[in-house]
Amino acid sequence: MKPVFLLLATLLLGPTAALRAADGPARKPNIILILTDDQGYGDLGRHGHPLLKTPHLDALHDQSVRFEQFYVSPSCSPTRAALLTGMHEFRNGVTHTTQPREHLNKEAILLPQLLLSAGYRTGFIGKWHLGGEGDHAPEKRGFEWCSTNVGGPNVHFDPVMVRNRKREPRKGYREDIFFDEAMAFIDEPKDAPFFCYLATYSPHAPLAAPEEFMAPFRGKVDAEEAAYLGMVANLDHNLGRLMRHLRERKLEDNTILVFMNDNGQTHGLDVFNAGMRGSKCTIWQGGSRALSFWKWAGKWSPHTVPNLTAHLDVLPTLCDLAGAPLPPPLGPKLEGFTLRPLLESATPIKWNDDRLLFHHVGRWPSGLGAAHKYAMASVQTGDLLLVRSRPCDDPACKQYSSQCTTLRSVEAGATAATYTKADAQFHWGVTPPGRWSLFDLKKDPACRNDLATERSELTAKLAASYDQWWDSLYPAMIRLGGDQGEPEPLSKGRAKKQK
């Protein structure tokens, strides 16, 4: 164990427990956290996809505790920041997917640091996207083993891999190699439980997969959609390889396997979106409702959980299950809750029924954060969604490329927009100016019937909670760089491209 984390263990656990952490505790559960990139909630057979066949994802679904109302942030880096800190991403300065606003606060305590201090060996494979240089890099944030590829999402085949700072050319498809790396990390002969964070690039653009995975979709959808679906099919194949690997090594019964995605639907939006409105980078359900399958074969019976849950809950849950205490300064800052009661109860239970979950798309032009307080924001409680899907009102924003650019074009009547060729009015739907809209997700999952006028008192109450939330985090967000950088001029013509 590295000295800095042995010190952290001493602070968290006391000297005796810290020594035990250094030696490695017996029979703590192994943990594998798989995070896919841009996969939609509907992108598997069990959720009704008309074209995708995903036998391994379907099997995991059937064997898992399934959180059917689990939410992430509407885009990539923000979700990763919230996932690893248990706090809304804005509180740690992450408001975009571009530098410097993707950089996660260097002072934040991350999940791998807590697990390392509790005796786990920690491995990261794949996409980081929280600042890859200097003290932002994963090897400086609690990961002992780090493996990724040179060129990120742009190199699909025969990548140069970097494992623990050593470069090695590899043959094959990038995601196959990522799963190979995860299995190599799992197989390291060390007497300690492991935490493996496997973050894929698939099915994020640019889109490409081995032909055998794209072939079933050719002629049924266009080439872009066939490549996207092929990437998901390849992920399913690799999930099957990993699950078989755990069985063969007799690790299945003592390994917690968590599978989730980082944001909503992208290039498969026009094919299937599970009846939801919205895509990645929108504030609608389709932008943030996520897969969340939790399997511990030796402990939990498969069941479906209807409670409102989120990426914020991953850190407190895994620390609880791993016996990793939270340092006193961190506990009050956490916005997530342990899911353990929901994982262990096969019947529905009351659990944080008054929870308020706040979302904001972020991604505004740098320097214009204050003007975007009410642009693309939402509050969710139970089955109710309070939402504003509007461009900001600041004239300065119009000269830059942002989500506001797309919303202005949709408000002007455009039918095509990012990720959709003909249904922008629905998926990028613009709400009325100057007010919030309210929807009952249970009765109206597509969010077509606005209840704000009918339920005006509740609307006002939720709107006030949003104001309080934004005002509480805004100073820290600004201090930690959430509004820094140079805005992207609209003349670059990248309004329809998303990272």
Model region roles, listed by residue range:
Residues 2, 6-11, 19-437, 445-468, ...:
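Formylglycine-dependent sulfatase
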Residues 473-474:
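Non-catalytic accessory segments flanking enzyme active sites
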